[in-house]
Amino acid sequence: MGVMEILVSTLEAVPGYRVAQVLGVVKGSTVRSKHLGKDLLAGLRTLVGGELPEYTEMLQEAREVAEARMLEEARRLGAHAVLGVRYATASVMQGAAEILVYGTAVRLEPARER
């Protein structure tokens, strides 16, 4: 038996389905910091401007970890979907950031046609 796929959406509804049960808010977070060497390289890049790929990569990885943690919580609840998903980022200390992802875990059923 495979892992149940859970729909993740910023929408509040899923076309063709209705929310049968609201299971509650689910969330996932992680705090990440950059390696000192990469931090120095990124600091040098700020002098000339442009994207800081070291931080872009770190934040992308952190979002993936936070989302996986949120989905694990949704899976434990038996959710079919997590709706209204939002991401938040906060600096927790010099060189470290928290990524938080949250939404509403729901069970869905096909919408009845009228």
Swiss-Prot record:
It comes from the Bacteria. Gene3D superfamilies: Hypothetical protein apc22750. Chain B. Pfam families: YbjQ_1. InterPro entries: UPF0145_dom_sf, UPF0145_YbjQ-like. Belongs to the UPF0145 family. This is UPF0145 protein TT_C1581. It comes from Thermus thermophilus (strain ATCC BAA-163 / DSM 7039 / HB27).
